[in-house]
């Protein structure tokens, strides 16, 4: 059942922010508002400062990749209002080449979150004070959480005793990629389990 306070908040935000929002979504007892790309800073500043909102805590920023969409990336901001005891998710959609305005001017703690999102997805943030990789190794190529990034990666690194240093080599698979069947009987699958033949002997 949806919390009545979230329904009231959604109505309030739609009235106050108007066309700065593309949509509001209720799912799993949570409220998500989708902001226009060019209005993300205004939206974040409003929900932080407005007396009915007070979402002063930014708890996370993350990316989501939808390769089939023109704007393939969602940038998701998780916010908390300690005074109202409410959580809010703000999303914005973008593509590989269009930067999102940095939230650092609104939430100073956004700096490392945006660096992580850039490192994992390649999402660009305009106005960021230090947009460089933070999790992957020096010289890493590609963005590992994109759906089109290979599971094995492109190179593997190891310490070479002879060279006395870390070296990078093309990935060599010790066995072929295997496709596991994770279907289990209680999920409704209809298939015969292998047996040792003892049941047939009893018949």
Curated annotation (Swiss-Prot):
The record's catalysed reaction(s) read: a quinone + NADH + 5 H(+)(in) = a quinol + NAD(+) + 4 H(+)(out)
Per the record, membrane topology reads: Peripheral membrane protein
- GO molecular function terms noted in the UniProt entry: NADH dehydrogenase (ubiquinone) activity; NADH:ubiquinone reductase (non-electrogenic) activity; quinone binding
Q: Where in the cell is it found?
A: Cell inner membrane
Main subcellular localization, coarse class? Answer: membrane
- The EC designation for this entry is 7.1.1.-
Please give one Pfam family short name. Complex1_30kDa
Alphabetical UniProt keywords:
Cell inner membrane, Cell membrane, Membrane, NAD, Quinone, Translocase, Transport, Ubiquinone
Which PROSITE patterns does this chain map to?
COMPLEX1_30K
Q: Name one GO cellular component term.
A: plasma membrane
Against InterPro entries, the record matches this protein to: NADH_DH_suC, NADH_quin_OxRdtase_su_C/D-like, NADH_UbQ_OxRdtase_30kDa_su, NADH_UbQ_OxRdtase_CS
Chain's role = NDH-1 shuttles electrons from NADH, via FMN and iron-sulfur (Fe-S) centers, to quinones in the respiratory chain. The immediate electron acceptor for the enzyme in this species is believed to be ubiquinone. Couples the redox reaction to proton translocation (for every two electrons transferred, four hydrogen ions are translocated across the cytoplasmic membrane), and thus conserves the redox energy in a proton gradient.
- Outline the subunit composition: NDH-1 is composed of 14 different subunits. Subunits NuoB, C, D, E, F, and G constitute the peripheral sector of the complex.
> What protein is this chain from?
NADH-quinone oxidoreductase subunit C
Q: What is the lineage of its organism?
A: Bacteria, Pseudomonadati, Pseudomonadota, Alphaproteobacteria, Hyphomicrobiales
């Amino acid at each position: 059942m949806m919390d009545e306070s979230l329904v009231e908040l959604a109505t309030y935000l739609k009235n106050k922010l108007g066309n700065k929002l593309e949509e509001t979504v209720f799912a799993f007892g949570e409220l998500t508002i989708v902001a226009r790309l060019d209005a993300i800073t205004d939206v974040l500043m409003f929900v932080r400062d407005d007396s009915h909102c007070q979402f002063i805590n930014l708890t996370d920023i993350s990316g989501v990749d939808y390769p089939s969409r023109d704007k393939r990336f969602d940038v998701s901001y998780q916010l908390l209002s300690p005074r109202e005891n409410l959580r809010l998710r703000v999303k914005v959609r973008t593509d590989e080449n269009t930067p999102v305005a940095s939230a650092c001017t609104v939430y100073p703690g956004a700096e490392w979150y945006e660096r992580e999102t850039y490192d994992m997805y390649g999402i660009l943030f305009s106005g960021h004070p230090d947009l460089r990789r933070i999790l992957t190794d020096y010289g890493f190529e590609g963005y590992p959480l994109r759906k089109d990034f290979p599971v094995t990666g492109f190179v593997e690194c190891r310490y070479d005793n002879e060279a006395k240093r870390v070296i990078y080599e093309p990935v060599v698979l010790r066995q072929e990629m295997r496709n596991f069947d994770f279907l289990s009987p209680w999920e409704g699958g209809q298939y015969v389990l292998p047996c040792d033949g003892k049941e047939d002997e009893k018949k």
